[in-house]
């Protein structure tokens, strides 16, 4: 069976938990937990986690010089960040997309589905 990574993209300027009530935050996290638990119960979940929004390092090699440039923050040239990921077991892209289609992250951002090469 193949593995597929679901990269959960979101705009941190749009989805800000500090602007939400504690009840709303718990409701959102509950939706993610229920979805994750269902995938695990069906034997489809291979892993996953939320990533910190405000931390990280972007590393870029300078062509031919051997120098590496390191920038603070997870951001490339995009407003969106990868907020988290899941790894699912599926027979095909079609099945992976079907499994991801009711992931609660679609309420807040986009999901990029990619097959992991074996």
Model features per residue range: what roles?
Residues 1-118:
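Conserved, structured core segments of small domains
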